[in-house]
Amino acid sequence: LETDRMIDSWNRLLQNVLPNEPNLIVLPEICDQYYNYPVPRRHEYYEVRGNRVRDFFMEKAYKNSCHIAYSAVRKMDDGTFRNSTQIINPRGEIVGIYNKNHPTIGETEEDNILPGKDAKVISCDFGKVACAICFDLNFDPLWEKYKPQSPDIILFSSAYHGGLMQNYRAYRLRSYFIGSIIDLENTVINPVGQTIAKSTNYFGYVTHDINLDYK
């Protein structure tokens, strides 16, 4: 029932952006979690949820011929967890997974979420994307790994806005930056660090066209 409610909620929310026929939808950090749940109940929910929400987004990506950046907690075979962004292509396939490199102390100590160690760009039909989650925004080593890979777009799923660090990372990597933030301003930033689109207090989503042929 909890999983059904979550899927129904996202099905309604996606109707705000799907009429614009997007090539890419970026979802906020841990987008299918009930944030008011204590840790034990949260872990019970993950067991019941399994991959059902992921499969829902895979079906949506396929039916609407778009990429979806799906951020969620994943349980690993050893019983530990990762805070991950999974990139789904228009054929409904997972083409890459990024594990948050810099989880918070609360995540590691309470939720048993371990840090990822890789920072590899993921190839999509339109170009290369670099993923980052929440506090990753503040740690230079991650971004120095990404810089020589020349990503076209940075996908930032977060519960934390980060302020001007968003613009700085876009400028430093000379990359577009898309910020999808829980209950805060969502942004599209160009490769020179200018915010070119953002959500408002009236609408919690933003759609925008960007030109990846500018180089």
Predicted feature descriptions by range:
Residues P38-V39, R74, Y98, I105, ...:
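A generic "cationic amphipathic patch" detector
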Residues T3-R91, R172:
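Cys-nucleophile CN-hydrolase/nitrilase-fold catalytic domain and related Cys-dependent amidase chemistry
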Residues E2-R5, Y45-V48, G106-D111, A130-F135, ...:
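Short, flexible loop segments at the rims of nucleotide/cofactor-binding pockets, characterized by
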Residues P22, A119-K120, T207:
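Histidine-/acidic-rich catalytic cores in large beta-rich domains
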Residues N23-L24, G127-V129, I153:
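Structural motif
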Residues R49-A69, L137-K215:
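CN hydrolase (nitrilase-like) catalytic-core segments centered on the catalytic cysteine
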Residues P28-I30, S71-R74, N101, I133, ...:
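Active-site-proximal beta-strand/loop segments in catalytic clefts of secreted hydrolases
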Residues M76-Q149, L164-M165, R172:
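Active-site catalytic loop in hydrolytic enzyme cores
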